Amino acid sequence: MRIRSALTALAVVLAGLVAGAGNSAAAGTTMATTASPYCGITWGSADKSAGALSSAPLVDVRTGRHDCYDRVVFEFAGPVDGYAVGYGETWTEGEGLALSPYTAGGALLRVSLRAPAYDDSHVGTVPYRVGEHAANLLRYPTLRDVVFGGSFEGYSTFAVGVRARLPFRTFVLAGPAGHSRIVLDVAHRW
């Protein structure tokens, strides 16, 4: 009788373990399924940098809205491929003044372009002064502000205010004509 009770108890325990293992396997399958990235974006939010210093001056800054991201384009009168972009405080070039108090947005991208915003005679090539807003971003889903931080010793700085810390990418495009562009895209969400 004792053996029969022990075997019955063992059978109940084993049945419970087998049932639990089946549920765990099903739960594991459910947990392994992840949502696909927003618009296929896999950029991340880590710092990005590339290229070398150039003497081709910055001549234009413009923005654009796309379905999955907002864009800032920096155009140069010649070949430029140097930049460093990352989240954090941005300082004016040559003065060291923090731009965060003057830049709208929940997060701040510091953009350092490895090219001047002045020509060979040291005359400014963009219409902005240090601290001025370079774009009207009304109705942009992600971008909140683009503030010129100045140009000093061949480097030009911008503070780009965004809604939150979001994935971004930076790349270089040739043209039009002999110009080049550094492009910054910031996703609308993760």
Question: Residue spans of the language-model regions?
Answer:
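Secretory targeting and sorting signals
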Residues: 1-28
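Short linear recognition/processing motifs and adjacent strand/loop elements at protein termini
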Residues: 27-190
